[in-house]
């Protein structure tokens, strides 16, 4: 979930802050949707700033159900749903794979370079039943997902005591065979008012879930690349594991053991005391516990074709935290003036524990607990970590309005985080907003027949982000290093004690219109966000011995608009038809980087001044050379057209249809080897055009962020029966498909390309192909 673009480079800090019943949570995965009564999204800094440092990417406020005064009400709900693949990845069938094998064989026989597969004749033998099948692996490992959910709730109460209890069970059978998810959760909400001046309440949530999964990346790779004519079973009926270097997806699905048991518990208690009709005090206390226990076993059948050693994993992750928040509120109304002042303090602490055990080659494939691997632990991968993180805050808010017509809201929050050194531990996050309900002005009386409410809003605020490692500001060392069988301590991270808060300044201008007794409502917003002190990994020279260090690397902006329209098309006693539409656009720009230096984030993301977050970085093709002679360019790198007659090159070139007599240049690899027919014609960016294709010729080839997003929803209601339809759209934005890239790069003989590539690849001189020759050769066609 992203709100108003991306305001940080940090992967941990891109998500919004979740507030559930007043409690900030890192995740809402364990919440039963049937427990939710309302959800509110805070987008602008003025409304989000009260939540401080973690609200730079917006705040989602969730309120769960509470009991109502009256007799106990019991509700039972059951829901069953189905799920299918929304898009099936095209896979080559047996005929297409044999065609590809033939193409490669003919290519090597014609151009040399080695045998593509010395056993190709055996593998393609139509009389050998083991290789005479036509598998659609995706169909073989997938089916219709089945989802069941049951909820039983009871709620009610008296004037003093109200309660709500819900127990839910969710069971999902995954689309991929032998995968699934189960969840059992209970929520107990209660509110108690023993006197007129005291209120208290509790929110208790308990969740247990069990996930049965697989290594989706490895499985997808096997599905897309394994030859379709390889049988999945041997003639004796036993299951094939790894054959010809390729894993059998059926064996992976049926023999891999991967269970994750998750335990979550959240306990929230509040106390509220009213000193008089103006002044009240509230204390919030929360404790949260989260435990993950994962057991995984890769049997010897699918781990290695020759050594056949199984591999076991055990992961234990514990996260618990507590929070205390104390708030004093004063509210007063004097004639037409409404005034509220609030001041509070907050403290929160987290503790993280992680244990990892990896074992190799146990005596059985049926015991996945680590005692089976006790004699063969992989010490380089086995270990444990312990870390802590704490925050302290003080905050205040003042609100004022005159007749509800002129509105003012001011907030100041000061947060301290243990993730920064003493000098930069504290961050200040102020905000202010004003509003004008112009529909209440005398000069707007003429609009009362159609305009019920009209308001203009403006706000400015600063929010922060501290989503980095718990100890990134200090040097770290590891005692787990082993070299030549001898243990030792090595430095693992360079500290930076001048790390500071990432700050996002946001200006927002909004308009709210309500027509004909809420028959039509329109909300429009324009925002401008500017982030300073971006926290990211800064690449270091190799001579330092470290890959990177955490630092404040630059600045970034996000600008855009949001429009939402909701209307009741039909509103009668029995019939109601409501429709809503929203659209938003965000423009992101990296304004500044340290020393103006661009750098790679991961394998594909390119960060540069003037660029955008989500830019893909790679080589861009201008097509495929039809002939060896097509690799011909002018001194200005304009491509020339070779002249052929009856298939024979005439040693002539054309430029814009006219014979060219100037100097001829070629594109080459760094070693001087020229590109040939069937190779990609790689483009070169302005300023690097020298004809030598190397890493300097990579450029931005796309972006993952959409240009426009939005939704369309409609609900038709007749008495107590309703029909809801919802649509979400995203325009622009691209996806980097690593699996598609890997299977279509021709690097490995056994890899099966997509059908589109097989039917549109270059095979003979003169082919006007989309894809290159069926042989990988460095930059030529990778």
Predicted regions and their residues:
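Membrane-proximal, glycine/serine-rich, low-complexity loop/turn segments characteristic
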Residues: 1-17, 25-28, 46-272, 338-339, ...
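Conserved active-site-proximal loop/helix segments of enzymes involved in bacterial cell-wall
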Residues: 536-539, 691, 741
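Phosphoinositide-dependent membrane-docking surfaces
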Residues: 33-42
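C-terminal beta-signal and adjacent terminal beta-strands/loops
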Residues: 84, 140-141, 449, 589, ...
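Non-catalytic regulatory/gating segments with a bias toward low-complexity or hydrophobic composition
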Residues: 22, 39-40, 60-62, 563
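Extracellular/periplasmic, surface-exposed regions of secreted and cell-surface proteins
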Residues: 15-17, 148, 183, 189-208, ...
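Conserved small-residue
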Residues: 75-77, 81-128, 356-358, 551, ...
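Outer-membrane beta-barrel transmembrane strand signature
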Residues: 122-155, 160-166, 237-274, 376-397, ...
């Amino acid at each position: 979930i992203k709100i108003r673009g991306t305001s940080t480079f940090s992967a941990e800090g891109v998500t919004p802050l979740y507030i559930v019943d007043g409690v900030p949570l890192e995740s809402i995965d364990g919440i039963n949707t049937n427990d939710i009564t309302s959800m509110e999204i805070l987008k602008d800094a003025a409304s989000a700033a009260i939540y401080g440092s973690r609200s730079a990417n917006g705040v989602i406020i969730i309120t769960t159900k509470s009991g109502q005064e009256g007799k106990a009400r019991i509700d039972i709900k059951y829901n069953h749903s189905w799920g299918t693949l929304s898009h099936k990845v095209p896979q080559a069938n047996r005929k297409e794979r044999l065609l590809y094998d033939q193409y490669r064989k003919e290519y090597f026989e014609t151009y040399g370079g080695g045998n593509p597969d010395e056993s190709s004749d055996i593998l393609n033998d139509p009389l050998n039943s083991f290789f005479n099948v036509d598998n659609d692996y995706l169909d073989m490992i997938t089916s219709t997902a089945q989802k069941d959910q049951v909820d039983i709730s009871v709620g009610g109460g008296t004037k003093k005591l109200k309660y709500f209890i819900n127990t839910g069970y969710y069971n999902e059978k995954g689309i991929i065979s032998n995968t699934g998810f189960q969840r059992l959760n209970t929520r107990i909400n209660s509110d108690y008012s023993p006197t007129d001046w005291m209120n208290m309440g509790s929110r208790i949530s308990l969740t247990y879930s069990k996930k049965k999964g697989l290594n989706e990346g490895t499985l997808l790779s096997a599905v897309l690349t394994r030859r379709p004519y390889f049988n999945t079973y041997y003639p004796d009926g036993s299951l094939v594991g790894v054959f010809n270097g390729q894993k059998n997806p059926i064996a992976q699905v049926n023999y891999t053991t991967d269970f994750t048991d998750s335990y979550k518990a959240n306990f929230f208690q509040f106390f509220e005391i009213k000193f008089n009709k103006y002044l009240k005090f509230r204390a919030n206390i929360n404790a949260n516990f989260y435990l993950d226990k994962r057991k995984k076993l890769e049997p010897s059948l699918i781990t290695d074709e020759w050594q056949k050693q199984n591999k076991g994993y055990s992961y234990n992750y514990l996260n618990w935290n507590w929070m205390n928040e104390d708030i004093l509120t004063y509210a007063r109304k004097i004639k037409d003036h409404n005034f509220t002042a609030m001041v509070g303090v907050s403290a929160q602490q987290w503790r993280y524990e992680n244990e990892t055990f990896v074992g190799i080659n146990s005596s059985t494939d049926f015991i996945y607990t680590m005692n089976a691997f006790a004699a063969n632990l992989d010490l380089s991968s086995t270990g444990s970590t312990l870390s802590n993180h704490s925050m302290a805050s003080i905050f205040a808010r003042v609100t004022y309005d005159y007749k509800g017509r002129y509105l003012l809201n001011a907030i100041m929050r000061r947060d301290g985080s243990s993730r920064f050194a003493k000098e930069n531990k504290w961050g200040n996050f102020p905000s202010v907003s004003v509003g004008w309900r112009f529909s209440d002005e005398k000069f707007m009386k003429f609009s009362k027949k159609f305009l019920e409410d009209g308001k203009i809003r403006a706000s400015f605020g600063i929010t922060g982000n501290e989503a980095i490692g718990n100890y990134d500001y200090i040097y770290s060392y590891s005692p787990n290093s082993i070299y030549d069988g001898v243990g030792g301590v090595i430095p693992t991270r360079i500290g930076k004690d001048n790390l500071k808060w990432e700050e996002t300044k946001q200006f927002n201008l909004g308009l709210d219109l309500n027509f004909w007794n809420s028959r039509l409502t329109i909300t429009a917003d324009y925002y401008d966000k500017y982030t300073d002190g971006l926290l990211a990994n800064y690449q270091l020279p190799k001579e330092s011995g470290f890959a990177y260090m955490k630092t404040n690397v630059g600045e970034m902006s996000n600008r855009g608009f949001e429009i939402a329209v909701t209307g009741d098309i039909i509103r009668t006693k029995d019939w109601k038809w409501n429709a809503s539409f929203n659209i938003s656009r965000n423009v992101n720009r990296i304004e500044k980087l340290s020393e103006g230096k661009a750098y790679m984030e991961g394998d594909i993301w390119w960060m540069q001044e003037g660029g955008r977050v989500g830019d893909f970085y790679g080589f861009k093709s201008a097509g495929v050379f039809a002939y060896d002679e097509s690799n011909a360019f002018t001194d200005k790198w304009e491509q020339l057209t070779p002249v052929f007659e009856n298939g024979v090159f005439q040693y002539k070139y054309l430029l814009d249809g006219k014979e060219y007599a100037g100097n001829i240049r070629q594109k080459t690899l760094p070693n001087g080897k020229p590109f040939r027919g069937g190779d990609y014609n790689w483009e070169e960016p302005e300023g690097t055009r020298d004809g030598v294709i190397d890493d300097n010729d990579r450029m931005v080839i796309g972006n993952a962020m959409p240009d426009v997003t939005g939704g369309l929803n409609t609900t038709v209601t007749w008495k107590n029966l309703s029909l809801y339809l919802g649509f979400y759209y995203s325009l622009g934005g691209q996806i980097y498909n690593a699996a598609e890239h890997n299977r279509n790069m021709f690097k490995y003989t056994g890899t099966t390309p997509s059908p589109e590539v097989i039917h549109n690849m270059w095979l003979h001189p003169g082919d006007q192909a989309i894809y290159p020759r069926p042989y990988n050769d460095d930059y030529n066609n990778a």
